[in-house]
UniProtKB/Swiss-Prot annotation:
This is Adenylyltransferase and sulfurtransferase MOCS3. The gene is Uba4. Pfam families: Rhodanese, ThiF. ATP binds at residues 99, 120, 127-131, 144, 188-189. Its cofactor is Zn(2+). It catalyses: [molybdopterin-synthase sulfur-carrier protein]-C-terminal Gly-Gly + ATP + H(+) = [molybdopterin-synthase sulfur-carrier protein]-C-terminal Gly-Gly-AMP + diphosphate; [molybdopterin-synthase sulfur-carrier protein]-C-terminal Gly-Gly-AMP + S-sulfanyl-L-cysteinyl-[cysteine desulfurase] + AH2 = [molybdopterin-synthase sulfur-carrier protein]-C-terminal-Gly-aminoethanethioate + L-cysteinyl-[cysteine desulfurase] + A + AMP + 2 H(+). Zn(2+) binds at residues 230, 233, 305, 308. It is found in: Cytoplasm, Cytosol. It comes from Drosophila virilis (Fruit fly).
Length: 452
């Protein structure tokens, strides 16, 4: 009886703590909402207000606060007062306030860039916080541009910040970008890269392009100088959608995005003040696993480039989602490879798993399988499933061809690839995909199941 009472007290204490944590989170959300409502009411914003550019002032001198704040870079012989004034009078547009955009914005703002434009359509999520260092737990659910603006003004209240909380596209890109001297591509999708490249080339603005995935990063500057290539000179044709991996699928270490994002800020500063050798016509490749940097030469301008050549074929912005065959965002695109009868929804599977003998294959990588898994699932990574010799050995070990096989992955994309391949190689077996994957399981069946 005493032990049971102690267990009950422990459980009650745990529930009280959870309630307190939820109440604190709710209070923070309500405060964020009040802040946003008060700012909106104060400024009488109209629906297109986020497309109105901040007025750019030109400064001829530094004030005492500038001298005190930027003293450590002012004393650099290659920087000095003239360099600081160029920064103060500059305007930089950052597209994407994620793992690259946050450190880039942070260092540009701290260095004294006078005007920053922030473009991002998304809201802050918990999965962002390990690498997107301007955002906080309290600001989860807030627009990324607004969250970044709050953090940046705490760093440097003298920086003019204009937020564009929307998806950059062919209809608004030229209007937004025209007001800025330099554009930083901190996006995580191919369609936006082509859009930014074409717009920067047409507007004759340098494009500082960074990317990071897993433990690797890349950095270069496009559309800079007479011989500097544009993105299309290097990649005239977009890759097939199935060959593209983003951070959501492949993963990334926060310190890697921080490294590349900080160096994007450095390249922007160099361009603004005319310092050093700008990374145009070259690409910096960072290998985080060995902490090595390599600097490789890339091709010069392509004489027949469709955008930057003397006689371009593309003279206006196009439909980049159509051109690339993928969405202009970093969200995972749901693939549709299977017929409805080749799939099962998670609610039907939940009922079946308790009553019918079957085999559940999880085709995620071992590192992901270790994070969480459904009961009695077997980890067979997708690479193994696509290996015909492995698949034949697997089939030989099955007790019966009558045993139904279900396949699951994180979001229901890789599992479709696996099922499609398995059904052609093992036609005598009943093989179906778990529609929506583990994300659907969390959303529809068990909300306590971890989501990542």
């Amino acid at each position: 009886m005493i032990a049971a009472a102690n267990c009950l007290e422990t459980e009650k204490a745990k529930l009280r703590r959870e309630i307190a944590e939820l109440q604190a989170a709710l209070n923070a959300k309500e405060q964020n909402l009040r802040d946003l409502q008060s700012r909106t009411a104060a400024s009488h914003l109209d629906p297109e207000a986020d497309l109105q550019h901040a007025t750019r002032e030109q400064y001829a001198t530094l004030n005492n606060d500038d001298i005190a704040r930027y003293s450590r870079q002012l004393i650099l012989s290659d920087f000095g007062v003239s360099g600081q004034l160029k920064l103060k009078n500059s305007a930089v547009l950052i597209v994407g306030l994620g793992g690259l955009g946050c450190p880039a914005a942070q260092y540009l703002c701290s260095a004294g860039c006078g005007n920053l434009g922030l473009v991002d359509y998304d809201e802050v999520e918990r999965s962002n916080l390990h690498r997107q260092t301007l955002h906080t737990v309290a600001r989860c659910g807030m627009s990324k541009t607004e969250s970044a603006r709050i953090a940046l003004l705490e760093l440097n209240p003298h920086c003019r910040i204009t937020c564009y909380p929307r998806l950059l596209n062919s209809s608004n890109a030229m209007h937004i970008m025209r007001a800025y001297d330099i554009v930083l591509d901190c996006s995580d999708n191919v369609a936006t890269r082509y859009l930014l490249n074409d717009a920067c080339t047409m507007l004759r603005k340098p494009l500082v392009s960074g990317s990071a995935l897993k433990l690797d990063g890349q950095l270069t500057v496009y559309s800079y100088g007479a011989q500097g290539p544009c993105y299309r000179c290097i990649y005239p044709v977009p890759p097939p959608p199935e060959a593209v991996t983003n951070c959501g699928d492949g993963g990334v270490l926060g310190a890697v995005t921080g490294t590349i994002g900080a160096m994007q800020a450095l390249e922007a500063i160099k361009i603004i003040i005319g310092l050093g050798d700008v990374l145009a016509g070259r690409m910096l490749i960072f290998d985080g696993s060995s902490c090595q940097f390599r600097n490789i030469k890339i091709r010069s301008k392509r004489p027949n480039c469709h955008v930057c050549s003397a006689q371009p074929l593309i003279t206006g912005l196009i439909d980049y989602e159509l051109f690339c065959g993928m969405n202009a965002n970093d969200k995972d695109n749901a693939v549709k490879l299977l017929e409805p009868e080749e799939r099962i929804n998670v609610l039907d599977y939940q009922r079946l798993m308790k009553t019918k003998a079957h085999l559940l294959l999880d085709v995620r990588a071992p590192a992901e399988f270790e994070i969480c898994q459904l009961p009695d699932s077997i980890n067979v990574p997708l690479a193994h499933v696509l290996d015909d010799s492995y698949l034949q050995r697997f089939a030989q070990q099955l007790e019966s061809k009558e045993l139904p096989i279900f396949v699951v992955c994180r979001r229901g994309n890789d599992s479709q690839i696996a099922v499609q391949h398995m059904r052609t190689r093992l036609p005598e077996h009943s093989i179906r995909d778990l529609e929506g994957g583990l994300h659907a399981w969390t959303n529809q069946v068990d909300q306590s199941f971890p989501i990542y």
